[in-house]
């Protein structure tokens, strides 16, 4: 949901054309997150300011438009921007916007500027909750707004505080100015700011919205971390001016040590990571982004910012400052990590869509989730990220699983096996509802958070809620370095690989497997459950090959969509036991990708109202794979066929009990252990949703109104 990308080159000659191309490529890698408009800002040319004695400044070129990145790319071509100018130090920023404040219109697109000259330029993800009060205050100070967005308030706050400082005879550095602005913001943000007052500099900061910095150098960095500079370590500790002040009139009121007009505050130290062997400046490129996918083509060396971090880049250095004071136990460094991601993983290859590619990657992603974690010969599960916490989790009073969307369905799908193997009560919560109810959480609870991105806003807020109450927290995520993976006590990385399509497919099956492995690891030492334990592990061993068998149904499913489902307006999915979660997940896929109304129904509730919808015209998909509830599912199918319904039945291969003269058709899948059957049953539904969308001419990877990473509430 929205995407930020910034590019900084220092002592690396780049033409303006190359810089623009880097920004556009970065935005293209962010498209999958969902957006409705895009824009970039780069340096223009030296311009004289007649209102300031013809003082020269570097103006900025801001180009933005509604629609796709390819529309922005064409607009840049149409505007015939001079691409030949060479820069050895330059900051360019770019953004894809998903509308929250203000409609998708050009004036609401990012980047936003502080004033007509563009003294400060900002791109921002998140929601500023006090923007109405800020806007009212800034209007009272004479600022003129061009958009309806909350982000424009941030840009104007930068100019407002800059002018106050200059009026007081102080020239603050960009980091200190950023702190003053952040002091006034409420809500969530990930933002970048550049200014012609600070050429070649950029500040990036985050609170509740992801931001990382990629580092590319020819020489090896001296250390693989960057020191965090806390307030007590810094030479200048400004007393933050409040927006309700009438305006500071002296440096003392602003809390600064006075410096000569026009002279920047002294910078007395250099980051250890960027010291060169010969003490000469090191050529370096920085890539600031909200997503690793946009950085991996340039570098695999990345630093993930924490909430309240300020990344200040200038003179080829990256400095990390804190917008808040140091608390006990807080880390004093930010590690520079190596991304475990390859460029080909975020390319479509021979497939038409990312979703299709990711559906067919599931044999590999399922295997990768288990690789190195299950000893199939001795039937032992070892999850390194949980190993030291298992004894604590086994003693907990209850397990609370908290997630959103598809991740919520993976929790529902595995709740029963958790309860069976651990004999610990398990509840499954939607993160937003959990927060709305302010559900009681205790110190002896274990709260399990599941998220593909690890940045889902509702889940992160629920995580913070549980941490405040002293609960043990576990993260099940697909993104190393994400907020959730850093804030939880322990967890499991599902190793599904990058998932670009908005509709989650391989992440669902990998989450499902990871949760089953979690349940197995909790019962590793149980003698009474040894037989069940071994049965499930042997079943997991066969899952990748069985998924390959299910994928062979694609042509049959494609024909089924063409002949029976394309023109339908609604669809019911019936499931019971382990397959109720599969029905819900299938219904969600069909809704979000094909725009067809679909509903997952618990088969046991059929006679409590749902039967009123059944007739010969309503398409129904029923799950009738073999488990302990099979007779009850067959009873539900009989109730449907008795009312002229002709369901599509997903059953096990060679199951002769289902009469073909009563049902519309059958989709046969291999038989596996009851608690794993949902891994195979969900794949026909993924294919149905995909082919329905393709047949309707829908952009499968970018369904309307949806975003991959939901980073706002």
Curated annotation (Swiss-Prot):
CDD domains: GFAT (cd00714), SIS_GlmS_GlmD_1 (cd05008), SIS_GlmS_GlmD_2 (cd05009). Pathway: Nucleotide-sugar biosynthesis; UDP-N-acetyl-alpha-D-glucosamine biosynthesis; alpha-D-glucosamine 6-phosphate from D-fructose 6-phosphate: step 1/1. It comes from the Eukaryota. Transmembrane segments: none annotated. Residues 2-316 form the Glutamine amidotransferase type-2 domain. One of its GO terms (molecular function) is carbohydrate derivative binding. The keyword Magnesium does not apply. InterPro entries: GATase_2_dom, GFAT_N, GlmS/AgaS_SIS, GlmS/FrlB_SIS, Ntn_hydrolases_N, SIS_dom, SIS_dom_sf. Keywords: Aminotransferase, Glutamine amidotransferase, Repeat, Transferase. Disulfide bonds: none annotated. The keyword Transferase applies. NCBIfam families: PRK00331.1 (NF001484). Involved in amino sugar synthesis (formation of chitin, supplies the amino sugars of asparagine-linked oligosaccharides of glycoproteins). This is Glutamine--fructose-6-phosphate aminotransferase [isomerizing]. It comes from Candida albicans (strain SC5314 / ATCC MYA-2876) (Yeast). The lineage of its organism: Eukaryota, Fungi, Dikarya, Ascomycota, Saccharomycotina. The gene is GFA1.
């Amino acid at each position: 949901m929205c995407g930020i990308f910034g590019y900084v080159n220092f002592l690396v000659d780049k033409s303006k054309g190359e810089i623009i191309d880097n920004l556009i490529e970065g935005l293209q890698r962010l498209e999958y997150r969902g957006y409705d408009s895009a824009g970039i800002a780069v340096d223009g040319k030296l311009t004289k300011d007649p209102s300031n004695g013809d003082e020269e400044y570097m103006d900025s070129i801001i180009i933005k438009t509604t629609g796709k990145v390819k529309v922005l790319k064409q607009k840049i071509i149409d505007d015939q921007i001079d691409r030949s100018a060479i820069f050895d130090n330059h900051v360019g920023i770019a953004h894809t916007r998903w509308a929250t404040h203000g409609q998708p219109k050009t004036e609401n697109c990012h980047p936003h500027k502080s004033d007509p000259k563009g003294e400060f330029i900002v791109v921002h993800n998140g929601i500023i909750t006090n923007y109405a009060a800020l806007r009212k205050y800034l209007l009272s100070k004479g600022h003129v707004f061009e958009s309806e967005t909350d982000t424009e308030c941030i840009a104007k706050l930068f100019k407002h505080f800059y002018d106050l400082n200059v009026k007081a005879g102080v020239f603050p550095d960009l980091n200190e100015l950023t702190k003053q602005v952040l002091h006034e913001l409420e809500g969530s943000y990930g933002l970048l700011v550049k200014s012609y007052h600070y050429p070649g500099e950029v500040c990036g900061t985050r609170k509740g919205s992801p931001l990382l910095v990629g580092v590319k150098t020819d020489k090896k960095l001296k250390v693989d971390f960057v020191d965090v500079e806390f307030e007590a370590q810094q030479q200048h500790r400004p007393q933050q001016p409040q927006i309700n002040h009438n305006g500071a009139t002296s440096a003392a009121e602003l809390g600064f040590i006075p410096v000569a007009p026009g002279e920047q505050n002294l910078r007395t130290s250099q980051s250890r990571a960027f010291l060169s062997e010969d003490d000469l400046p090191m050529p370096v490129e920085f890539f600031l982004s909200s997503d690793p996918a946009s950085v991996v083509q340039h570098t695999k060396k990345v630093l993930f910012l924490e909430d309240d971090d300020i990344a200040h880049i200038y003179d080829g250095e990256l400095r990390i400052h804190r917008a808040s004071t140091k608390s006990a136990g807080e880390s004093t460094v930010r590690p520079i990590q190596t991304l475990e991601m390859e460029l080909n993983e975020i390319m479509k290859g021979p497939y038409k869509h990312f979703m299709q590619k990711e559906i067919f990657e599931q044999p590999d992603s399922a295997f990768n989730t288990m690789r190195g974690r299950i000893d199939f010969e001795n039937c032992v599960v070892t999850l390194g990220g949980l190993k030291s916490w298992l004894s604590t989790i086994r003693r907990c009073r209850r397990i609370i699983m908290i997630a959103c969307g598809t991740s919520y369905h993976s929790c529902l799908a595995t709740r029963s096996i958790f309860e069976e193997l651990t004999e610990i009560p398990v509840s499954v919560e939607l993160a937003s509802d959990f927060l709305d109810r302010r559900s009681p959480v205790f110190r002896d609870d274990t709260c399990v958070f599941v998220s593909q991105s690890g940045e889902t806003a509702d889940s992160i807020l629920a995580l913070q809620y549980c941490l405040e109450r002293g609960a043990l927290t576990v993260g099940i995520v697909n993104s190393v370095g994400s907020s959730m993976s850093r804030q939880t006590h322990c967890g499991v990385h599902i190793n599904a690989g990058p998932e670009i399509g908005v509709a989650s497919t391989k992440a669902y099956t990998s989450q499902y497997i990871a949760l089953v492995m979690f349940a197995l690891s909790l019962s590793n030492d149980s003698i009474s459950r040894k037989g069940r334990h071994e049965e499930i592990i042997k079943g997991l061993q066969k899952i990748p090959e069985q998924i390959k068998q299910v994928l062979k149904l694609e042509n049959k499913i494609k024909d089924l969509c063409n002949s029976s489902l394309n023109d339908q307006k609604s669809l019911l999915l019936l499931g019971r036991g382990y397959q109720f979660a599969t029905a819900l997940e299938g219904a969600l896929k069909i809704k979000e990708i094909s725009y067809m109304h679909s509903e997952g129904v618990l088969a046991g509730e059929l006679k409590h109202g749902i039967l009123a919808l059944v007739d010969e015209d309503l398409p129904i998909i029923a799950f009738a794979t073999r488990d302990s509830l099979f007779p009850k599912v067959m009873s539900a199918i009989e109730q449907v066929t008795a009312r002229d319904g002709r369901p599509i039945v997903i059953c096990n291969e060679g199951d002769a009990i289902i009469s073909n003269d009563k049902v519309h058709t059958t989709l046969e899948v291999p038989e596996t252990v009851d608690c794993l059957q949902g891994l195979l049953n969900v794949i026909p539904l993924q294919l149905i949703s995909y082919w329905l969308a393709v047949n309707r001419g829908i952009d499968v990877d970018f369904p309307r109104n949806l975003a991959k990473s939901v980073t706002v509430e």
